[in-house]
Regions:
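Active-site beta-strand/loop signature of hydrolases that rely on acidic residues for catalysis
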Residues: 1-4, 82-88, 105-108
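Core catalytic region of metal-dependent phosphoesterases/phosphodiesterases
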Residues: 1-36
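Divalent metal-coordination and catalytic microenvironments
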Residues: 2, 27, 44, 88, ...
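Solvent-exposed loop/turn segments at secondary-structure junctions
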Residues: 3-8, 33-35, 49-52, 89-93, ...
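Binuclear metal-dependent hydrolase catalytic cores centered on His/Asp/Glu-rich metal-binding motifs
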Residues: 22-24, 37-83, 93, 161-164
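Short acidic-hydrophobic surface loop/beta-edge motif
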Residues: 31-38, 139-145
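Conserved beta-sheet core of the metallophosphoesterase superfamily
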Residues: 90-172
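Short beta-strand-to-coil "C-cap" segments at the C-terminal boundary of structured domains/repeats
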Residues: 174-178
Length: 178
């Protein structure tokens, strides 16, 4: 789920979960499913919250996390299967050293709309939650334990802050190969 869907849930204007399930969708918010593809297991999870908590010295601290979130992430990474986490906000893993803490093969993310405005030779101008001239607004990024993070520019725009300019919308297709 993204921030717009979370907003619908907060306003309680509709039974979004019920409508999604009725349409056949599987909602993976702090949840995961193991699926079989050509005799290989892939674990797919979903997370909107931040995947970190910071202690008094500014370091990643699993013990300071909300226990439900910590337990979900520890359970999610406890498999030999290939692990894909869908996390709307890339900052869920880039802040607080979370990308160097959790053992996840691939995080798929968006939220920053490619930086809204792309300046030639400089990249994205503004990324939600990352601020001005953000690093993680599109492309593939690698970390110590989160092996790959793909951040898509997506299709939308944050028209309240900046209109999308010089920033071609995208849908990312990922081919997984053994």
């Amino acid at each position: 789920l993204g921030n717009h869907e979370i907003g619908y849930l907060d306003r309680k204007t509709s039974d979004l979960y019920g409508e999604l399930k009725k349409a056949g969708a599987v909602v993976l918010e702090k949840n995961y499913e193991d699926i079989k593809v050509k005799n290989h297991t892939i674990r797919i999870g979903g997370l909107y919250e931040y995947a970190f908590a910071v202690d008094g010295q500014g370091k990643m601290s699993k013990k300071d996390m909300n226990s439900g979130l910590r337990d979900f992430l520890m359970d999610f990474e406890d498999t030999k299967a290939f692990k894909i986490m869908m996390s709307h906000r890339p900052d869920s893993f880039i802040f607080g050293q979370a990308a160097d803490t959790w053992k996840i093969d691939l995080v798929v993310s968006g939220h920053a709309h490619g930086g809204q405005v792309i300046l030639p030779g400089m990249g994205g101008l503004y990324g939600a939650d990352q601020g001005w001239f953000p690093k993680y607004v599109d492309g593939i990024h690698h970390f110590r334990t989160v092996k790959n993070m793909i951040v898509t520019r997506g299709l939308g725009s944050d028209k309240e802050k900046l209109p999308r300019f010089n920033n071609i919308p995208e849908i990312v297709v990922i081919d997984l190969k053994k």
